[in-house]
């Protein structure tokens, strides 16, 4: 989809992030504005400037948009999942369409190209694809708990952000008054609660999924009333802002104190009058009102869990899901880290402190109507902050600020320009930059004279002889005609803490201006502007720029404070073996004591050496304290693991589950829900409770409910979870769900789907788009439709050569849409939210309506499938009967019955007699055994094919293919008594970390095979994963198996075969750099960070491979026992010797570095091998990162991989496309990928080419690998496999 269309160029507005002040008394000097070509990265961006990213999500950047400098937020970077962004991609650097209104996107999505980022420009919210080097980083967004590294340091260790300090430049909404600097801790949320907030209600933790709001309004006659936000939305803002119509603006929270609204009297017919004289509600009158306060009157909450509550009730029943206004006082919001979340475009409340000297105000002309052009604000703000500012004047509490101030001061350096010709010029006529800034300095307080009723302090006033008097005479029924510029600004910026009316007339409106008022504006055009205020006043502001500094605790235990965030870069893909000080760990070494009361606390870490200093603690029997065991120990990171229960990170939400510290008696009102503030190396956790009190508490007394929070976000609490069949396959790291390449549009998908279905299909009316529905129910319904429609994929492929008929094209589009809907969350699918345990009476009705619509969709699609299958049957080529029968619901339930009598005959027809072994052309074997082993993963699953003869016909073809086409390194066995079961053994490819290893799989063919893919189970032999796609719970992630949705030939169809899956596992999973198989990690290929992570992953993989092979030697599975022994009698010792040779090579290189004379000799002796490898593996060519993760993982350095012609051709295409960048200067080549990982090795390092990144070996790896090699040797000797002389 194209970028949202933007307003006219004159409307563009942005703000720069000021840098630290150069002089104490002056405003912070801003960074230099970008030039016409936009500034690229500075030359000092680090030693590896060309091998690390320039920008990350949420970065504040500046660049040229529509001819002027704008500021914006990076919303998406290449290789990042676009879940939250949908597919509203822009059009690259060419810009966006000029047509349409701001914030509306159009066109079709385009992929985010390498080297580009998606930027959302402020204030309109237009999204655009821009080249990274055309943007200037103004402020990097980091929050507590982020893992970061130094941008300008050779030190590669990472650290954890423990606190941030954000200085903001804020603009008073409705004006162009800029206040800087304002610390983010001094900004408050406008609304006390918002959607998605986590709250504590007595002992319960919940999440707000809906809320009911109201606004308190004050009329000019002093009357006050309360109005719900639905009616309030019918009023319009007298002082609108450009961002009100852009994507930075949230309609749900569009009201703020001090806002001036106007609307017809009929809207006030249903309000509740609180005080004052109720005005006459004339049909022709219009009321002008000031928002005095915004209130939440009702919360709807999904309850997550209950905490330890000694003084409370023992009931486990959650409170009512609806919290009414009288109980809101018992609700406490978890928001101790709100100050770290401020970003561009956010609206907040600012309370002026008692000491205001540090704050600076720069004021330019009042902001024009959002329909008028403003020019670019970025340069103006920079210039104002750099040159001169308006000095703040502090009024004493009893000093009243008059409404009229017309005194001229000849010493002022400029004129207050009150927006010439507001409302008279069209956007096209308004020139860019017409709203020039005011550069003036207030010389001090002046003798002021009250002319009328005083208004609240902190006013932006303009002189005028008649304007303010006319404001006094403003009646409600005349509000639409009064456009006094001054009083509008006064109202919008007035303090809600004052008891004054705050009413006034409009500075700018979307209604026509009278000639009288237009003349009045021109008359006051040159009047001076001042602003007075008093401490404690609250004003609504909008963040226009930020400057962030962070405190970081590094892995070595040191703490560095006030680091400019631009000098850091976030680490998104963190190795599981990276530990930080304060992490709780357990010992994985076999000789360690498995006492559950013993745990370790990381004191410091050596990132390069891959070791940690750990203190071991043991919980005392009393349970109220711990004792230190032994001395601090230097441990390899591969020998420890995260504690299964004690996982605490800053900002985690926790509940108290145990007694208080030191045996103190629990208080009845003791807080029990809070957030982690700090994890201490002393084995305790500091918690900020919901009442803002702090406690340092033992981890045994806390429970981290982050996992429950994630489940509550995705699962409905009304029904059961997604079912055992789903749960048993899901773990805490579902990284296998890689980018599927499908377009996941949001609401347009529903409309598109409705359009392609037959006319009789009922569709939900437009007003039902906001239905609230549990995601589980919606997902179950959609998955049902997809599961029912999926088998037709193979049917469609059998269409004639002339192309599929229209009915098939429509059906294919419907299936595609359903698949994309299946992968979307409910929040993406609908403008709603998860339901609570108890909902309002009308909610189940709307949910039922949605489910009924989905059910009708399923039924209609099923009818379409049936009709198409019948109508096109004669046009198809031998469509298998099983594909036409698979839609019958009764075939899904297994029925226990005897195997048909023709089974042995079928076995004989395919040569499947028990004990018969077939040797393929490449020397591998396929054999049929008599009985399936009892420990086969799928043996206990009852199976009865609906059409036995047809099913066995398919099996016969599979067996024939396996018997003749198995490649090197794959063995398969099936069983006479269960021909739906298979067992497979795959040898690890050479020049990969998996070489000389054996990897076993159990397989079952479903009853409707081949309409659906086979079931695979990996037989893991170690704790943890040795490959991103092979889980220790048995899950195998390959696109052909449907565990993630691939593209084209990567998807399973009725023509796919078991052999294809086995080859995919061998060639696309067991690769030389498995790290890049992780979802989204392939975008790191060619970056320094990616290389380091890949090397460390290979270290971990090698350790787990040796551990797995040790288990296989000691307890070989029955099916392949003979093959395993035969393999390891030779391959086992080959594996041992190869790793030992790597250890010796590393030791030699270490000695060579210590002795310079020897270094030259050692390096020169080994360098020719490295040079030869480099010439063989490719010439430092750009690499295609657009391939599927599995395909891209098999680099050119691997000889045993399965990088086919298709991959090679794509590589060649990518090289051609990126060739023009070769002549560009280094600063514009930050994302250039290199084919060979060896390019990251130190020059003339002399390390041999082993096919995958491993050198230099870390100290932790050497410690761990020696330990597991010792165990492997012992296992080989115990199994009667002594090392031969040839092996040595």
Swiss-Prot record:
Species this protein is from: Mus musculus
Q: Which residues carry this modification: Phosphothreonine?
A: 483, 486, 835
Tell what triggers its expression.
By EPO/Erythropoietin which induces erythroid differentiation.
Keyword annotations for this protein, in alphabetical order, are:
ATP-binding, Coiled coil, Cytoplasm, Nucleotide-binding, Nucleus, Phosphoprotein, Transferase, Ubl conjugation, Ubl conjugation pathway
Give the protein family: Belongs to the ubiquitin-conjugating enzyme family.
Which SMART domains does the record match to this protein? UBCc (SM00212)
The name of this protein is (E3-independent) E2 ubiquitin-conjugating enzyme UBE2O
Molecular-function annotations in GO = ATP binding; ubiquitin conjugating enzyme activity; ubiquitin protein ligase activity; ubiquitin-protein transferase activity
Q: Which GO terms describe its biological process?
A: positive regulation of BMP signaling pathway; protein K63-linked ubiquitination; protein monoubiquitination; retrograde transport, endosome to Golgi
